[in-house]
Amino acid sequence: MHAKSLTELRAALDAKECSAVELAQHYLKRIDAARDLNAFVHVDAELTLAQAKAADAALAKGEAGPLAGLPIAHKDVFVTRGWRSTAGSKMLANYASPFDATVVARLSAAGMVTLGKTNMDEFAMGSSNENSAFGPVKNPWDTNAVPGGSSGGSSAAVAARLAPAATGTDTGGSIRQPASFAGVTGIKPTYGRVSRYGMIAFASSLDQGGPMARSAADCALLLNAMAGFDERDSTSLERADEDYTRHLGKTWAAGGDAGKPLAGLRIGLPAEYFGAGLADDVRAAIDAALKTYETLGATLVPVSLPKTELSIPVYYVIAPAEASSNLSRFDGVRYGHRAAEYRDLLDMYKKSRAEGFGPEVKRRILVGTYVLSHGYYDAYYLQAQKIRRIIAQDFQEAFKSCDVIMGPASPTVAWDIGAKGDDPVQMYLADIYTLSVSLAGLPGMSVPCGFGAGANAKRPVGLQIIGNYFDEARMLQVADAFQRATDWHVQEPAGV
């Protein structure tokens, strides 16, 4: 059952080959048997089965939503009524939200059944899921390796078939990089396409929720439910709803040749994504994927994104600045961790934050406070915002000669747990290919396209596909065509 896609699972439910309750029980057993991966931080079988029973009742009455009875795991950055919502932090270890995030509410309204909350880097700050207050997550493909971050629990859960789908968030690559490391498909939509209401904030001008699943087709189904305007989110874009599945299985050009379904598609290859720092085994997997696209009829076009190397310093000015502001609310007064002993109010603030936040979160708060301080705001923050606009302009210039941009999602495959913990800069450099997409607010996704070599032969490689604003449906079409021609996305870790 766990090898089936969302479409196949829904067909099984409609044909009464299984019930939503039986499906939920199946996945709950798998989650329990895979505790060692540490992919989940909160599972409540009673809550899950109650939702599954409601889905079965709706299916029986013919009143079911489009995703009725299908299980999903939620990244623990989305507040969820009835479940703890921790953001991977001791600061919120016992926080119970009185409401659902819009993403959770929309998927629930479509009939999905929540399996639990997945582990993550604390407040979504990290690239390895080692920054969680609840311990690191292991990569199902190689348990010595990280699953990526910050949505590492979600990527591991989908890869290990503990859930057929999961939600994630992407601030600088936190859907795409873990999807790459764990061999699953994940998409970060255009900024503002998916509501941030109820998503615990890291960097408000960058955070964006999105789906993670086995395939592009599954992600399209999920995005149909997740995307849309939300008046409760001031950054939500008012735009007509669309069907993200509408191009799947169709030729790129109307009336095109089914034997060359992507004839007419122009794929931009930035020179900056294939230079120094890209591991040979990753380059080989990406090159092979691009050859597959050529056999499908696509044309490869050289493009340039000259400010790519500036995306890391720009991101690590803007994101920490916004984080320092967003996280100032956690002071031990209204909610969150409060120190047990303190002398006065100021001491309570200091001790509560010192005890509640982990090292990486503290580091970014300090950096953010510094760049926003008097005398440095103009030199750092305003300058970073100017370069951010130039980065976005570079993409628009590139899109004049191509329809999508492709390259690696990460310069390497997943590294060993603990390998980069003492050198945060090396961890930051791992996001070189994803940060600029987030800074520009563009949609981007990662699809499995191979594995590393030698000692890394069990560690997946992800191909990043970048589209122009609101081009998600076309990107999903491009990814789906690749997945119809290859089987990387259906391969499973040993023992699954």
Swiss-Prot record:
InterPro entries listed in its UniProt record: Amidase, Amidase_CS, Amidase_dom, AS_sf, GatA
Active site: residue positions: 75, 150, 174
Keywords in alphabetical order: ATP-binding, Ligase, Nucleotide-binding, Protein biosynthesis
UniProt record, GO biological process: translation
Annotated GO MF terms: ATP binding; glutaminyl-tRNA synthase (glutamine-hydrolyzing) activity
Pfam families: Amidase
The EC number(s) this enzyme carries: 6.3.5.7
Reaction it catalyzes: L-glutamyl-tRNA(Gln) + L-glutamine + ATP + H2O = L-glutaminyl-tRNA(Gln) + L-glutamate + ADP + phosphate + H(+)
Recorded coiled-coil stretches: none
EC top class named in words: ligase
Transmembrane segment boundaries: none
GO CC, any one term: glutamyl-tRNA(Gln) amidotransferase complex
UniProt keyword ATP-binding present: yes
Keyword Glycoprotein: no
Subunit structure: Heterotrimer of A, B and C subunits.
Similarity comment: family membership: Belongs to the amidase family. GatA subfamily.
Function description: Allows the formation of correctly charged Gln-tRNA(Gln) through the transamidation of misacylated Glu-tRNA(Gln) in organisms which lack glutaminyl-tRNA synthetase. The reaction takes place in the presence of glutamine and ATP through an activated gamma-phospho-Glu-tRNA(Gln).
Protein's recorded name: Glutamyl-tRNA(Gln) amidotransferase subunit A
UniProt source species: Burkholderia thailandensis (strain ATCC 700388 / DSM 13276 / CCUG 48851 / CIP 106301 / E264)
